[in-house]
Amino acid sequence: MSNLVVEIIETNQAAADVMSGSGIAADSRPGVQFHEHLHLWVWRPRGILNEAMIDDIIECIKAKEDKVGKPFNRFTDLSVIDAIDLHFKYVFHVALHRRLSYLHHPPLKSAFYVTSSATAHYIKIYALVCDHSPLRVEMFKERTAAATWLDVPIGFIDQSREGNA
C-alpha cells in the first residue's frame, strides 16, 4: 500500500474514533480533550469566560505538558461562551507571561475559533503580544481553516462531528 493510502486510512480511522468517542483522552475539566497522537489540546469553554477559568486552564495545560514531556498545539472553540468578563490588563499580562514561559521552547500553534467581534478583540490582543515568539497564535472564523492550519483532520476540532453540539 502507498503511504498516501495508509495516511487516508489512518485519518479516517482517527475521525471515526472521535465520532465514536474513543481515541480521546478526556480531561477532568468539562470541554477539554487531548488527542495525544496529534499533540492537540482542544478546549471548548462554556458559560462566562473569566480570569478564574483562564487561570485554571493554563494550570491544566502546564500539568499536561509536564506529563507529556513537551508542548502541544491547541484549539480553543470560543463560539459557545455566554459572555466575557475580562479586562485588557489581564489579557495583556497572561499573554506576556505565556510568551516569556515559552521563550526557550519549540514553536507551537494555538488556534482560536471565534464567532463574535467582542471575543475577537481579546484574541487579537493575545496574538499581538505573542507575536514573534514560539507561540504562534491565529484566530479563525471557520473551523476548517483552523484544522488546516493545525494540520489535523476537521473531525478532531468540529464539535458537530463529535456529537456534542
Regions found by a protein language model. Give the residues of each.
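Amphipathic, Lys/Arg-enriched alpha-helical "gate/interface" segment within cytosolic domains
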Residues: 2-165
